[in-house]
């Protein structure tokens, strides 16, 4: 556990050196760098934060061997003044050895062990709060949701045009105000009650599924759990999620006519 904690801390520290300029200059990057390029940058950083692989060299390039020292204690000869049969107590040959009584009287716990336990507690707490909150929200949103067969048929046509092989169930819910896709393994498209089915809405939400954006967000969440102590990682997660929406918008509008682009732009403005 201590080795894992130290590796996580080292990865968090090294990634922070890259995150600081990226996050501070986020506005400049958004204006001068394509969203898809930033998508790759955030993905690489998230993978590095989550995948705990030691990238150090198997053998250091330069090794310096510390010199070894031996301490020889002079032998003590029996004194003529000592009575016959008396034994002379020889000093311990191990330099720095402590008495067993002193070692058992004081029990020390390494600082790394305490920090490792604190880190593990934070990981479990973050997973419990966020993961449990997600499960409760999913249950609440789906509890009163009802199927919409007409919208599901339209979503099936849109999914086929996007190349999705699996149909996505569509539900109506009074608990949502904007359309959303819920679920990573078994996704469900939730639409607000009473809202008309819009083609651009279906394209936007189903494009998220085609791009595997839910898995991308799950990776960001895992990075936040492992590095809960690093505010830069949480900041990175928000920045990457915002950039993810821009990438999705670019894919939806790519190759569309002016009417579709105008309608999609109006949708983005209405939901901003």
Enumerate the predicted regions with their spans.
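Auxiliary, metal-adjacent structural segments of Zn-dependent hydrolase domains
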Residues: 132-178
